[in-house]
Structure formats: C-alpha cells, structure tokens
C-alpha cells in the first residue's frame, strides 16, 4: 500500500474506532487527539524500508532496521506493537502527559498500517518471528492504485454513517470488552515490572 493509502486508511480506522466505541477511552476520546495521533504513527511500520516515505527521511534509523529485519518483518508484527508500548510505558518520563485517547490513537494508527498491508498479496508476519504471513489479498500493488483509495474512502464513509445503536452482543461490543481487558492486564504487567 502507498503512503497516501496508509494515511487515508488510518483516518478511516480512527473514525471507525471512535464511532464503534472500540474501547471506552476511544468512545469518550477527543477527535483532535485520536485522528492526529493515528496519522502520526500510521507510516511508522515502514521504517524498515529505506525507500519508504519515513525511510527516506530517517535513513540513519531505517537502514539498520532494514538490515536487521528486512521489509515487512518485525515492524509489521504484534510483537513490535507490544515492544513499542512497553518501551513507551517504561521509558517516557512520568512528567510527560499524553492523554489516553491520544496514546490509543497512536496504537490504532500503527495497527491500521499492519491491517492495510494485510490486504496486499505479500501480507504481514503478525506472529513474527514465526514466518507465517497473514493476508487477505484484495489490493494489487501498483502506483496510483484506485482500488486502494476506493476501499479507504468506503470505510471512511461507512464509519461516519454507520448505525450507532449496535446490539450489546455484537462483535464490536465483545471486542471492546476484550481490548479493555487486555489494556488493563498490560498496565498491570508493566506496573508490576516497574515495581520490581
């Protein structure tokens, strides 16, 4: 997927996550925190490709990561998301206040990139270092891909006008509870590690 596609897809995912109330924090969150945060991180997984939008601007980071992991390796995995969150919680000074909705927006932007790359034939190694590729190849990579734009805009339009009265037993409500539980457990784990 192109940088433009990732930007559009991250905005669409942010709108969907907020309107679907994917987590309680996102449901109550501020649009001006969630959407810019998602945009900020939506290109980050491609830091492993020196010719990517970020790779060209941050060659001093991109080249070593590309040598170590290759393109669509570690940075396109759930382990990378966990590692970045753990690093954030352990290394960011407590005096730095980042709203919870902005942090979830950043995670959402990163995950939107991985999800978008799953729509290409190459897929992504979600369970890296396991080499299995997860894919739903509906996008064929080509410059100026109109299908890419169409899918992003369709998701955006649906997210804006989706029904807000979803049944309590729907998949969205279930996933919201699961994400909230995982977030609480992650916070407890990090807090426990910091105390010892």
Swiss-Prot record:
Q: Where in the cell is it found?
A: Cell inner membrane
Note whether Membrane occurs among the keywords.
yes
- On the Periplasmic side, which residues? 1-23, 99-106, 171-196
Q: What is its main location?
A: membrane
- Membrane topology, as annotated: Multi-pass membrane protein
Topology Cytoplasmic: residue spans: 45-77, 128-149
Biological processes annotated in GO: DNA damage response
Per the UniProt record, one Pfam family is YdjM
A GO cellular component term found in this entry reads: plasma membrane
Q: Where are the transmembrane segments?
A: 24-44, 78-98, 107-127, 150-170
InterPro entries assigned to the protein according to its UniProt record, in alphabetical order: YdjM, YdjM-like
Q: What induces it?
A: Repressed by LexA, induced by DNA damage; it has 2 LexA binding sites both of which bind LexA with high affinity in a cooperative manner.
Q: Does the record's keyword annotation contain Nucleotidyltransferase? A: no
- Keywords for the protein's UniProt record, in alphabetical order: Cell inner membrane, Cell membrane, Membrane, Transmembrane, Transmembrane helix
Q: Which family does it belong to?
A: To B.subtilis YvsG.
Protein's name according to its UniProt entry: Inner membrane protein YdjM
Q: Which organism is it from?
A: Escherichia coli (strain K12)
């Amino acid at each position: 997927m192109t940088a433009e596609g990732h930007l559009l897809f991250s905005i669409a995912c942010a709108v969907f996550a907020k309107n679907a109330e994917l987590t309680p924090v996102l449901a109550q969150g501020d649009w001006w925190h969630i959407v810019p945060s998602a945009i900020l991180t939506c290109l980050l997984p491609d830091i492993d490709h020196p010719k990517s939008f970020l790779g060209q601007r941050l060659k001093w980071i991109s080249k070593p990561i590309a040598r170590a992991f290759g393109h669509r390796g570690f940075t396109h995995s759930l382990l990378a998301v966990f590692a970045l969150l753990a690093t954030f919680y352990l290394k960011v000074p407590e005096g730095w206040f980042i709203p919870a909705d902005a942090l979830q927006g950043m995670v959402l932007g990163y995950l939107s990139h991985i999800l978008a790359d799953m729509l290409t034939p190459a897929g992504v190694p979600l369970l890296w270092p396991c080499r299995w590729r997860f894919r739903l190849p509906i996008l064929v990579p080509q410059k100026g891909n109109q299908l890419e734009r169409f899918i992003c805009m369709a998701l955006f339009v649906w997210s804006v006008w989706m029904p807000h009265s979803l049944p309590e037993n729907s998949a969205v409500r279930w996933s919201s509870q699961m994400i909230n539980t995982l977030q609480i457990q992650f916070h407890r784990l990090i807090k426990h590690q910091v105390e010892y």
